[in-house]
């Protein structure tokens, strides 16, 4: 197990948080020089999805051999609870299924993700496809009818605009 402490600054507030993830470095040298990747927390098995579940990827162990993974959920870190109402993007806004505007939470999470990337010098992120925050190629159309459309989630779009390489779980093989 590996304990991480990170500090990020957002609107003059300092946020400290810790994450515990299992690391299996090949040797001590690699342990300290592995490239860091910010990854959707649900992909490493954290129960942060809107319904309280996760989307653990079977390729996480392979990624851990090559990268130091920094789990992060922009929706939770942006202030939304788990579980929570499902949300979908409508233009620049994000609305949940009971018609509440949760846009501010999504943009706050995106800014925190970028601050972590800056602080830790992270150049790549792996995000959950179809998510209103993390989708990198496909999102839902905002009608809650499960209709998929080309588009990006708030965090994916924000990070890409800031020069961070954005991948989805479908792209993990290209990183191995």
Q: How would you label these PLM feature ranges?
A:
Residues 77, 87-112, 116, 147-176:
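Divalent-metal-activated hydrolytic enzyme cores
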Residues 55-96:
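Short, surface-exposed acidic-centric catalytic microdomains
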Residues 34-37:
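Extreme N-terminal starter segment of soluble prokaryotic enzymes
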Residues 57-69, 109-124:
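Short amphipathic alpha-helices and their capping/turn segments at secondary-structure boundaries
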Residues 42, 128-131, 171:
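Short, well-ordered beta-to-alpha junction loops that form the rim of enzyme active sites
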Residues 8, 24-26:
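Polybasic, lysine-rich low-complexity intrinsically disordered segments
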């Amino acid at each position: 197990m590996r304990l991480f402490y990170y500090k990020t600054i957002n609107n003059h507030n300092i946020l400290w948080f810790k994450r515990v993830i299992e690391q299996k470095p090949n040797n001590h040298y690699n342990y300290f020089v592995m490239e860091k990747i910010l990854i959707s927390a649900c992909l490493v098995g954290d129960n942060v999805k809107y319904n309280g579940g996760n989307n653990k990827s079977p390729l996480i162990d392979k990624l851990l051999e090559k990268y130091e993974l920094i789990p992060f959920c922009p929706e939770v870190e942006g202030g939304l609870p788990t579980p929570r109402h499902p949300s979908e993007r409508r233009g620049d806004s994000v609305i949940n299924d009971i018609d509440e505007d949760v846009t501010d939470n999504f943009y706050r999470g995106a800014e925190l993700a970028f601050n972590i990337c800056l602080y830790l010098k992270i150049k790549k992120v792996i995000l959950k496809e179809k998510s209103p925050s993390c989708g990198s190629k496909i999102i839902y159309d905002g009608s809650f009818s499960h209709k998929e459309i080309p588009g990006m989630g708030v965090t994916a779009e924000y990070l890409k605009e800031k020069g961070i390489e954005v991948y989805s779980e479908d792209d993990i093989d290209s990183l191995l």
